[in-house]
């Protein structure tokens, strides 16, 4: 199916860490919706065809596993760490997130509120301000590099569930992924 798999073995601890990296980073954001890749990554953990966001969190917690879903400039990474005996189940959970996301509207609104709050809080932190301003000073806004990865208040306020599902359909798939 085109999924590239890379394995690095390190013996010593009964842990498995794996990441599903997809070429779906902020560079793929449409010019009018900076932050769409980041928002889509956050929404992956908010519901699938068979699990609610609470059930997803509970399943990872039951395994003692950690999960993060974040977009960078080039890639989106779903990173997981769990006990070695639980890695097949954790991998099945991650597969469910990227194969059957539902992007529930009520979760979308909650995530939007949280991200807008984070953006507003960041205005008081010089480091965060620099991270948001620098891309636009270095790169043209016509590229996928001239905006902050997390987007802008205007874009976050404007994006819709259709935007998220369209981005997911365009940017996610085994051909754009490395495990």
PLM feature segments, named:
Residues 2, 11-60, 92, 134:
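Active/ligand-binding-proximal structured segments within catalytic/core domains
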């Amino acid at each position: 199916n085109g999924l590239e798999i890379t394995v690095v073995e390190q013996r010593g601890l009964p842990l498995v860490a794996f990441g599903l990296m997809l070429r779906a980073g902020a560079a793929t954001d449409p010019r009018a919706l900076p932050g769409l890749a980041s928002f889509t990554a956050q929404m992956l953990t908010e519901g699938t065809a068979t699990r609610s966001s609470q059930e997803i969190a509970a399943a990872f917690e039951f395994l003692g596993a950690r999960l993060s879903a974040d977009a960078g400039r080039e890639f989106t990474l779903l990173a997981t760490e769990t006990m070695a005996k639980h890695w097949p189940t954790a991998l099945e959970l991650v597969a469910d997130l990227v194969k059957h996301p539902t992007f529930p509207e009520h979760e979308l609104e909650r995530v939007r509120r949280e991200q807008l709050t984070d953006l507003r809080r960041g205005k008081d932190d010089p480091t965060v301000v620099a991270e948001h301003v620098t891309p636009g000073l270095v790169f043209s806004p016509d590229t996928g590099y001239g905006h902050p990865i997390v987007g802008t208040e205007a874009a976050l306020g404007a994006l819709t569930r259709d935007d998220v599902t369209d981005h997911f359909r365009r940017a996610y798939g085994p051909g754009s992924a490395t495990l």
